[in-house]
Amino acid sequence: MLIKKNYSKFHFIHSTMKTTSCAIALERNVARLLTAGVIAGGALLSHAQTAAEPTDALTPEAIKIKSAIDDTHVITMGDEVMAKDSIGRLLNMFYIDQFRHFQDPRAPYFMFLSKNGNLALGVGGLIRIRGSFDWNGSIPINGFSPYFIPIPKDPTSMRRLSATGAGTGLFLTLLGKNSFLGNFMGFIQGDFSGNNYKDFKLKKAYFTAGDWTVGYATSTFEDTQAKPATIDGSGPNGGNSRTNVLVRYSHTFKEKWTVAGSFEFPSSSIKSDGVYTKGCSDYVPDIAAFIQYQWGGGASHVRLSGLGRVLTYRDLVVGKNYNIFGWGAQFSTTIKALPQLNFYGTVTFGKGHESYTTDLASDSFDLVEDPHEKGKLYAPKAIGYVLGAQYYFTKNVFADVALSEQRYYPKENPGDGQYKYGLYGAFNLFWDITSRFEVGMEY
């Protein structure tokens, strides 16, 4: 049985970009200052206040967004006053996003605006340096994921100092409005988190028009707003983290209820031996949906999410293909108890949904071998949870705490050295030195 915990990894990240895992992270936009993209934790959905609203009436998250919008440099051939108003309206649309993650970059510092003020384009950059020190043989890789904690500990790797610029990246944002599409946004993001944390990797590429989103985007099954902020890039291990090519419809009714559903191109992770069993190509789209109730202008919400998928394998003993239905269910919430205090919670369970989770996506757990019958695979059960809180000491200094666990339930107890469950605990402290420059540390 493998029990994974972390007590001794301290990440300090110095970044021109953002923070992840115990790190001091500085973020920067390629446009001039280091552009930090850390948008505090989970209440971004709510903050559509206008630029005219008094600052003292805004929450700390809304103040951050307003400050970033006010600092945006607009390049236009039209009237400069109108341009500032137009860019504010368009950028509010950028930040009010159900699927926006804490570590996503902020809008580009420089924005080109059309003469009529209905179209804006910006190209931004993000410099993010993460560093860590491990003094008790916790984990042999950059970042932190309990799945990779070695059991037993490796005596040759009991102390480790590391740093990476893998979060550094580029992004392009197109924002606009017209009579046919309504409000629309195109977004492309890539960074150097690919092979060996050096190769360039596409992170997102999607187009949103009105209630529709098409492209490579965050899965509808993931609630990015219900997660505490972490410097660690992986985040709490008991949550979901998945990006798919998808077609999604999302609509909000009377500012209180939101429903969404999507067809997502599948990518299953099946553990087979190639002798008695073999995974088959995916051919049925994953289906994800949620219903959400929100209040406080969207700063708080409760959400129920569901996932259904078809997992196919071949029994090489009898020479026949089989389909197994995989599913997942999730309850998630963000609650703004006070203007400066947020609470987060997520509980996820299911069978055959493991590749959507943070920890179990590190290996092949959607289907595994049946220990009682050769040639058979089955979808094991897994349960995970995330609890968190965030507190703003000032409008620029805030802290997050997170507690999370992922449990894996195969038909038989795993043997020694095999994953059974992982525990995750983290404390993060962030300081927004400017609207586009941030440092942080995590334990």
What are these model-derived regions, one by one?
Residues 137-147, 358-363:
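Short, flexible, mixed-charge acidic loops at enzyme active sites
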Residues 293-413:
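Detector for outer-membrane/organellar transmembrane beta-barrel domains
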Residues 18, 46-135:
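N-terminal periplasmic/intermembrane-space "pro-region" immediately following the signal or transit peptide
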Residues 112-143, 155-268, 283, 288, ...:
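Outer membrane beta-barrel
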Residues 1-54:
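Bacterial Sec-dependent N-terminal signal peptides
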Residues 183-194, 263-265, 304-310, 398-411, ...:
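Transmembrane beta-strand segments that form the barrel wall of outer-membrane beta-barrel proteins
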Residues 105-109, 150-157, 228-232, 272-274, ...:
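Extracytoplasmic loops and strand-loop junctions of Gram-negative outer membrane beta-barrel proteins
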